[in-house]
Amino acid sequence: MPLVSVDLRDRVAIVTGGGRGIGRAIALAYAGAGADVVISAARNLGEAEEVAALGDALPGSVHAVAADVTNDRDVDRLVARALERRGRIDVLVNNAARGMRFVNERFMTDPQPFWEADPEAWRLVIETNIVGVFLMSRAVIPRMLAAGRGSIVNVTVNQSTMVRRGFSPYGPSKAALEAMTQVWAAELDGTGVHINLLLPGGATATGMIQDDMPEGVELLDPEIVVPGALYLANAESSGERIIATAWNEP
């Protein structure tokens, strides 16, 4: 694992979906590096508040906000809370997502064809994984442009997951996220605002995984993304796609 020493003192970061899994790991890592971190939770504020309490022992801080990234007013409120810290936003991690469990609880063992999916569950995944990222990025980028700097980290998945049988709409939503990231990187070129992709590199122990996983499946620890997330907080380029399992190799 590469040694990533990052000083995030005086920085303000938003990590969506920061109450558990990958978001939790990134939020605590940023606070450990000195950042003021604001995390969102759409469904379980208690989890996010527990993460915030852990931040009390770190050089930085963690603040929990109940917010759904698909709701414009929630997004505005989340951004306003972050701006209360130091009047700016330096880093946005678009981590909040809805996985296949919202469409099919047993998606790993009993794949469901797309035509059998519930339309409302389908919409919820698309709204969170694509529209939510758009709303959050749209809300913070003007502030970053005014400051002449900023970093956006979009959390994605393996490309094989994007086209895997039974993984619709989750897989395709992440393919759309990656396409959006490349387009936005081009549009932000030369502004000082950078946008990149980060993924664990395999199935990860988060709330998105079904409870009875197939025998022999080993889950990655969410902490695996921490070195990459720290690196991207100070990114000076755009369009990178960091795969944690490969990037962490010595």
Where are each of the predicted segments found?
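Conserved glycine-rich cofactor-binding loop
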Residues: 19-20
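Conserved glycine-rich Rossmann-like NAD(P)H-binding loop of the short-chain dehydrogenase/reductase
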Residues: 33-50
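Conserved mid-core segment of classical short-chain dehydrogenase/reductases
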Residues: 76, 99-123, 146, 166-169
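Catalytic Tyr-X3-Lys loop
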Residues: 98, 111-134, 153, 177
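Active-site helix of classical SDR
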Residues: 137, 173
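Alpha-helical segment proximal to the catalytic Tyr-Lys
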Residues: 142, 185-187
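C-terminal helical subdomain
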Residues: 190, 197-199, 214-250
